[in-house]
């Protein structure tokens, strides 16, 4: 059972009958780049071989292309308008993330966290309303200092917050 021969022949086959591999010395460079999935790094001619089509090579390698694509993707994500921070609650082993830019201030933040963790959460505005089952919301700023949520204006909070922590309110 032999294999049937295709009626179409490539330019490499027809031009190189004497070479057992079907490759002439002039086409060796193109075949070697084809074996590297069409990626050419530092070719002097500025072209690479890709399935029979010759394309101009713009000097950007695969690694550089990936970095450019990742940067564009990150810029795209940032332009959407999201700013996620981690939220951990004392006694809960798994933290969550919350998008602060989707909220309209401290009241939205507290309402969302109350619902998310099913807890009564206090912040600077409600500091005097402490009960046995209440929790206090604090945040770590750029320097790593823990501050009470609500002590600074919302915009300043957004520029300095790195993560949130919900702790039990202790009575003294």
Swiss-Prot record:
**Alphabetized PROSITE patterns for the sequence:** PB1
Q: Where is this motif: EAR-like (transcriptional repression)?
A: 35-39
What induces it, per record?
Answer: By auxin.
Q: Where is this region: Disordered?
A: 1-28
Ranges where the PB1 domain occurs: 82-171
Top-level taxon of the source organism: Eukaryota
Where do the TM regions start and end? none
Q: Where is the composition biased (Low complexity)?
A: 1-18
Keyword check for Transferase, yes or no: no
Gene Ontology molecular function, alphabetical:
DNA-binding transcription factor activity; transcription cis-regulatory region binding
Keyword Nucleus among UniProt keywords: yes
In terms of SUPFAM superfamilies, this protein maps to: CAD & PB1 domains
Q: One Pfam family, please name it.
A: AUX_IAA
The cellular location(s) given in this protein's UniProt record come to:
Nucleus
Q: Which InterPro entries match?
A: AUX/IAA_dom, AUX_IAA, PB1-like
Q: Which GO terms describe its biological process?
A: auxin-activated signaling pathway; gravitropism; response to auxin; root development; somatic embryogenesis
Write down any Gene Ontology CC term: nucleus
Q: What keywords are assigned to this protein?
A: Auxin signaling pathway, Nucleus, Repressor, Transcription, Transcription regulation
Give the chief site where it resides. nucleus
Biological role stated in the UniProt entry: Aux/IAA proteins are short-lived transcriptional factors that function as repressors of early auxin response genes at low auxin concentrations. Repression is thought to result from the interaction with auxin response factors (ARFs), proteins that bind to the auxin-responsive promoter element (AuxRE). Formation of heterodimers with ARF proteins may alter their ability to modulate early auxin response genes expression.
Domain notes from UniProt: The N-terminal half of the protein contains two conserved domains I and II. Domain I includes a slightly degenerated ERF-associated amphiphilic repression (EAR) motif which seems to be involved in the activity of transcriptional repression. Domain II is required for the correct degradation of the protein through the SCF-mediated ubiquitin-proteasome pathway. Interactions between Aux/IAA proteins and auxin response factors (ARFs) occur through their C-terminal dimerization domains III and IV.
Its family remark reads:
Belongs to the Aux/IAA family.
Task: Give the multimer and partner information.
Answer: Homodimers and heterodimers.
- By what name is this protein known? Auxin-responsive protein IAA30
Specify the species.
Arabidopsis thaliana
Gene giving rise to this polypeptide: IAA30
């Amino acid at each position: 059972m032999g294999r049937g021969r295709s009626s179409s022949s490539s330019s490499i086959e027809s031009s190189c009958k004497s070479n057992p591999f079907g490759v002439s010395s002039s086409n060796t460079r193109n075949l070697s780049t084809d074996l590297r999935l069409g990626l050419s790094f530092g070719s002097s001619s500025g072209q690479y071989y890709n399935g029979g089509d010759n394309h101009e090579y713009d000097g950007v390698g695969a690694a550089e292309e990936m970095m450019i694509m990742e940067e564009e993707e990150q810029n795209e994500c940032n332009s959407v308008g999201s700013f996620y921070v981690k939220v951990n609650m004392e006694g809960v082993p798994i933290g969550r993330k919350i998008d602060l830019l989707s909220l309209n201030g401290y009241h939205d933040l507290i309402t969302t966290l109350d619902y998310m963790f099913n807890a009564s959460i206090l912040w600077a505005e409600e500091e005097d309303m402490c009960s046995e089952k209440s929790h206090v919301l604090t945040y770590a700023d750029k320097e790593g200092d823990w501050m009470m949520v609500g002590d600074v204006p919302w915009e300043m909070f957004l520029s300095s917050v790195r993560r949130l922590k919900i702790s039990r309110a202790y009575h003294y």
